[in-house]
C-alpha cells in the first residue's frame, strides 16, 4: 500500500513538473495561414517598432467615389473595407470647407471631391465620416492600429487653419490617438490611430505640433534614378525614407518599387514608405490601368517572411496584396 501511494505521489509530482515546464515555453511564432486580415497585428510582439514591420497601405484612400473618376479614382473599396482587407495606412487629402458658418475638413484628390456615394448628388466625404469608420474598426479590433497620414491638399488653404481644425477633431477622442513625434512600438498604439502629417507646422508659438512629421520633397521628376528614394527627418533621432515616383511609366515604376522591396531600409529608427502608385506619362492610361499592371507584379513578387518591408502603399488595393504584405511579418506555413 505504501509503495502504491509513493508511486502515485511521484506520478503527481512528475505531472506537475511537466506542466510547469510546458507553461514556461513560449508559444510558437504565428503561422501565415492562421492570420486573419482584421486582426493580423494581434500576434506581432508589443515591443516591435511600428517602422520595423511590413504594413499594407492605400494611396488616396478616400477615392472610392470621386468626381471625374477616370482621372482621380485610386481605390474601389471604402476605407472600412480597406481596413477589413488588412490595410493599416491611410493616405488622407484634406481641404477646408465652410459649412453652416464653420470650417470643416473634407476629402479631395486634387480638385475632385471624394463623396459618400456614387450618386452625382452625393455630399462630400468629411474627415468625421472617415474617423467614424476608423474608430469603429479599432473598437472591434483592439489589437490593431491605423496610421492616418494627413496632407493639406489645397495650396490656397492656410495650413495653420488646417492644423487647428484637424486637432480640434482629434481632441474629441483623445484616448484613441497617438500624437507624439517619435516612432512608437506596436504595444503603445494598439487600439489607437497614429497621426502623421505631411505639412510643416504653421501654428503660432505656444501651440504644440501633433503627430509624426512625414514631410518629404516632391518626387514628380521623371528622371530615372538608381536609388529612387529620398530621405527626410522625423525628429533628431529618426528618419523617413520615401519612394513616391508618381510620374514614372509602368516599367520604370516597377523597377523603383522592386529596388525598394529588395533593399528595404525599414528599421527601428526609419519609417520606409514605398508608393506603388503612379500617374505615368499617359502611355498606359488612367490610374486603374496602371494599377492593374503594377498589382499583378506585386502579387507575383517573391515576398520574404521575416523581412520588414515598411509601408507598401497601393492603388486599387485588393485583399490578396494586403495579405502578401502583412504575412511577411510571420513564419511560413509548415
Where are these regions (language model features)?
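Active-site groove signature of glycoside hydrolases
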Residues: 96, 141-157
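Loop/turn elements at helix/coil->beta-strand transitions in domains of secreted/extracellular proteins
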Residues: 85-90, 141-147, 172-174, 190-192, ...
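Bacterial N-terminal signal peptides
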Residues: 12-24
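Surface-exposed substrate-engagement region within the catalytic domains
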Residues: 171-304
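Sec-dependent signal peptide cleavage junction
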Residues: 21-33
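Long, acidic (Asp/Glu-rich), low-complexity accessory segments flanking structured domains
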Residues: 32-85, 98-140, 197, 201-205, ...
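A motif-centric signal for short, conserved binding hotspots located
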Residues: 93
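Bacterial N-terminal signal peptides that target proteins for export
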Residues: 2-13
Amino acid at each position: 500500500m505504501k509503495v502504491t501511494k509513493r508511486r502515485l505521489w511521484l506520478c503527481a509530482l512528475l505531472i506537475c513538473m511537466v506542466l510547469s515546464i510546458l507553461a514556461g515555453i513560449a508559444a510558437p511564432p504565428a503561422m501565415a495561414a492562421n492570420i486573419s486580415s482584421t486582426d493580423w497585428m494581434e500576434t506581432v510582439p508589443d515591443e516591435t517598432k511600428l517602422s520595423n514591420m511590413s504594413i499594407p497601405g492605400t494611396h488616396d484612400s478616400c477615392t472610392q467615389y470621386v468626381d471625374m473618376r477616370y482621372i482621380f479614382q485610386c481605390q474601389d473599396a471604402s476605407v472600412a473595407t480597406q481596413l477589413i482587407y488588412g490595410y493599416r495606412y491611410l493616405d488622407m487629402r484634406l481641404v477646408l470647407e465652410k459649412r453652416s458658418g464653420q470650417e470643416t475638413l473634407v476629402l479631395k484628390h486634387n480638385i475632385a471631391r471624394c463623396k459618400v456615394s456614387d450618386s452625382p448628388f452625393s455630399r462630400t466625404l468629411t474627415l468625421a465620416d472617415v474617423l467614424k469608420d476608423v474608430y469603429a474598426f479599432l473598437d472591434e479590433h483592439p489589437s490593431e492600429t491605423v496610421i492616418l497620414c494627413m496632407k493639406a491638399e489645397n495650396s490656397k488653404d492656410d495650413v495653420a487653419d488646417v492644423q487647428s481644425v484637424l486637432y480640434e477633431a482629434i481632441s474629441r477622442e483623445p484616448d484613441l490617438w497617438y500624437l507624439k513625434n517619435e516612432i512608437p512600438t506596436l504595444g503603445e498604439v494598439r487600439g489607437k490611430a497614429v497621426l502623421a502629417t505631411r505639412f510643416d507646422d504653421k501654428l503660432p508659438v505656444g501651440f504644440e505640433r501633433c503627430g509624426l512629421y512625414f514631410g518629404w520633397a516632391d518626387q514628380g521628376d521623371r528622371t530615372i534614378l538608381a536609388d529612387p528614394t529620398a530621405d527626410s527627418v522625423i525628429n533628431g533621432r529618426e528618419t523617413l525614407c520615401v519612394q513616391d515616383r508618381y510620374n514614372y511609366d509602368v516599367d520604370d515604376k516597377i523597377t523603383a518599387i522592386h529596388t525598394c522591396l529588395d533593399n528595404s531600409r525599414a528599421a527601428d529608427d526609419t519609417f520606409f514608405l514605398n508608393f506603388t502608385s503612379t500617374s505615368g506619362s499617359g502611355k498606359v492610361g488612367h490610374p486603374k490601368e496602371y494599377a492593374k499592371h503594377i498589382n499583378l507584379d506585386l502579387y507575383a513578387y517573391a515576398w520574404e517572411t521575416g523581412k520588414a518591408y515598411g509601408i507598401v502603399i497601393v492603388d486599387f488595393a485588393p485583399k490578396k496584396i494586403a495579405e502578401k504584405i502583412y504575412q511577411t511579418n510571420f513564419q511560413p506555413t509548415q
